[in-house]
């Protein structure tokens, strides 16, 4: 018999029902569960797939450059970044009538186009790209890298080039390589690009390969470096009247510590950014020489971890046994990587708007809103994934004998205390925050707004003041003009920083009040509840009082049959599944808060947020309802406009979201009966019954239906908000 899908599981391949297809797709990437898998093949498969992943990323970024060069308006945007709308790509749609063609022909284009809200124009402009030819060159280079990655992935699957398991488990060499080789060298290379190409570009000097060796980025070249006069590189920075991309008001400094923002572009000084990357490069190049490899010097990871025992002896054996536990568990390593990456992605969302690095991006409001929302949602998914793989580690890889009384074992021993603390924190935050909101709602409804309970966030205001914000009247640290902290930084970065913190036209340290206090605690509720569900799922993954043998059932099981009541819904996968809903809910509150506060800031009516955000009706009426008017107006009696695509996507997003409930609420029996009815009708319908199937159609399993429901819920939820966000922001600010 010919091999049927899935080849990696002969047991599944012989399943006579459609379960074969869905289970095959579901377990395609779970290499550990495949037939004849060895540890060596497992590591090699994952290693090769990383190259495939890189190839896809390079292809995607190449596509961005290529389409903007081919169909965009980069060169005209460069001439006037604040008034020309950047084009992502053309739209070819046979359904477009004349009104649609007119509505979507924008940004100086000849036909219908999509506007770019990704910030790539600002990014490319900042790093020194100026012409379509530059973009094509970049696209071709990335295409070349993509091909190289594919070849490398294929190569490392060939017998002669397959790395051994010992190579994959050489933690010190990998750390040194990643720290020095990837972070250190790439940061140094990026500093080089900024100094040699981007900074001259910002001063009207066009540097390419043909004049790369002729243009000195600094008049004295490397002289100050070798004579120890490094401070010369910071002298004569760009002036506050500098026009970006021209020599007007330009200086000669390349590595500065000015602080604050370039007055015209409203972004960080490019010379500050170069200095930052040089410092990072230095730190990581040093860090990558700390671990012992072939030369017998430096730290051994195992020794470091074994030495980490708490003093006094009352807190167990610390990190003993962790080295082998982590080094032999791919899920533990992935969990750590995802946890770190998730936090970093959320920090990127925060810093991209508060400390914008790209020229003119701060004045492109829709792009700012889109990038913040995009990175926060991605951070949410990555962080929940960290806990999922933590739970899989506990089920598949955790060895109690190896970890006796160390931090992992003690986490499991104290899980009741950990869960109950998270529980009371969530209950406290939930009831108090909702109580305050609802009280304020009732006061507004009864016409006595002065009876609201409004709490000033004085601790947060004090922290902002300590960083130099003077409007609250706290005379402390950097907001006090006669303190040592103020005097120490006065001659370098401080004036620029203080100017930025106290200027109300940017997003650095926004003024906060009672509305912020409430929504901050609502978000804290969401974060703690999500964490509670995820932590409980991981800590109970091996077993609980209710089901002590849970680990024998694997990561995702629906129930243990009718014989053991109450075993449904308690697999580690179920915890992940429930947590994703809470995660989406939380990121929803985060993005609503960010967007509403910024809309009022950009429109100059901050009082609307301050007055309406203290009660729930204010959020529903003055944020959601008021700002969805543009969406509902995409089609009107006068025809259509450029928001109609978002209006359609808003409706379509709701449809996808609602479809999720169809899978989440009804279970297998209903679908099985429906499928059998459909199969009966199919077999009795002329022409249709010429099409036969080999697999008996069966309903999705409980776990699969939940996954499909969750996927629709998540995609619909994000689609709906994306359309709302982009339409309401671009509708107001063009």
Curated annotation (Swiss-Prot):
Q: Mostly located where?
A: plastid
A GO term from the CC aspect? chloroplast thylakoid membrane
Quote the SUPFAM superfamilies the UniProt record gives: Photosystem I subunits PsaA/PsaB
Which E.C. number(s) belong to this protein?
Answer: 1.97.1.12
Localized where? Plastid, Chloroplast thylakoid membrane
Provide the transmembrane region boundaries. 46-69, 135-158, 175-199, 273-291, 330-353, 369-395, 417-439, 517-535, 575-596, 643-665, 707-727
Cofactor remark: P700 is a chlorophyll a/chlorophyll a' dimer, A0 is one or more chlorophyll a, A1 is one or both phylloquinones and FX is a shared 4Fe-4S iron-sulfur center.
* Record: residues binding chlorophyll a B1: 654
- Which amino acid positions bind phylloquinone, per UniProt? 671
UniProt catalytic activity: reduced [plastocyanin] + hnu + oxidized [2Fe-2S]-[ferredoxin] = oxidized [plastocyanin] + reduced [2Fe-2S]-[ferredoxin]
Q: Could you give a GO molecular-function term held by this entry?
A: electron transfer activity
**Lipid bilayer topology:** Multi-pass membrane protein
The residues listed in the UniProt record as binding chlorophyll a B3, with positions renumbered to this chain, are: 662, 670
Q: Which Pfam families match?
A: PsaA_PsaB
- The record lists [4Fe-4S] cluster as bound by 559, 568
GO BP annotations, alphabetical order: photosynthesis
Keywords linked to the UniProt accession? 4Fe-4S, Chlorophyll, Chloroplast, Chromophore, Electron transport, Iron, Iron-sulfur, Magnesium, Membrane, Metal-binding, Oxidoreductase, Photosynthesis, Photosystem I, Plastid, Thylakoid, Transmembrane, Transmembrane helix, Transport
Function description: PsaA and PsaB bind P700, the primary electron donor of photosystem I (PSI), as well as the electron acceptors A0, A1 and FX. PSI is a plastocyanin-ferredoxin oxidoreductase, converting photonic excitation into a charge separation, which transfers an electron from the donor P700 chlorophyll pair to the spectroscopically characterized acceptors A0, A1, FX, FA and FB in turn. Oxidized P700 is reduced on the lumenal side of the thylakoid membrane by plastocyanin.
The family line of this record is: Belongs to the PsaA/PsaB family.
Q: How does this polypeptide assemble, per the annotation?
A: The PsaA/B heterodimer binds the P700 chlorophyll special pair and subsequent electron acceptors. PSI consists of a core antenna complex that captures photons, and an electron transfer chain that converts photonic excitation into a charge separation. The eukaryotic PSI reaction center is composed of at least 11 subunits.
| PANTHER family in the cross-refs | OUTER MEMBRANE PROTEIN, OMPA-RELATED, PHOTOSYSTEM I P700 CHLOROPHYLL A APOPROTEIN A1-RELATED
> What protein am I looking at?
Photosystem I P700 chlorophyll a apoprotein A2
